[in-house]
Amino acid sequence: LGAPVTLDQVRIGPIVVGEDNKDHVLFPRKIGGRFIAFHRRWPNVWLAQSEDLRTWPEEWMAPIYGPRQDNYWDATSVGSNGVPIETEHGWLCLNHGYTTVVEGATSLTGSAVVTRMYRLGVILLDLDDPTKVVHRPKEPIFWPEELWELRGDVPNVVFNNGTVVVGDEVYVYYGGADHVVGLATCKLADLVDYARFG
């Protein structure tokens, strides 16, 4: 066996204190001389900026996008997932959203069962100014279909835990129904095309 590995770490603390704020994602490089991060101030995804990773001034924060109305797949809530991927067309960002799903009446209660359905989507942001949305497709790229995505600790969930690009292939590691880990893959060019034109 080899020697143990020690990971260096820096704890940067919360971006916002005292409110429902999660789904933090740090961009892989500085933009305009600042560190950039997504965070979710319910119900919208916000962009925050920092010069030192420790202070995130409120005046450098802005909402980028939020839930869509009507019958969209992300009509209730949205959040960011995985480090944005830099492409020639902009920042390719995976996101999640959910909406309420009403299922048929149960035999025990006679009333409908209301659950959430979490899906994965993609959004393209401007490369130099990620506060600008270049395109946001109307449909998700991935949704629960397998039994282990539909039934588990939290049913009807696919939730991206990390995205890796190897060559021209994108590997999306995701949680299924909050109890298993799955892997979905696609070609980077296909995902970029869908983000641009979908």
List each language-model region with its residue ranges.
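Beta-rich carbohydrate-recognition and catalytic domains
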Residues: 1-76, 85-153, 167-170, 174-198
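Electrostatic interaction modules used in gene-expression and signaling proteins
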Residues: 163-165
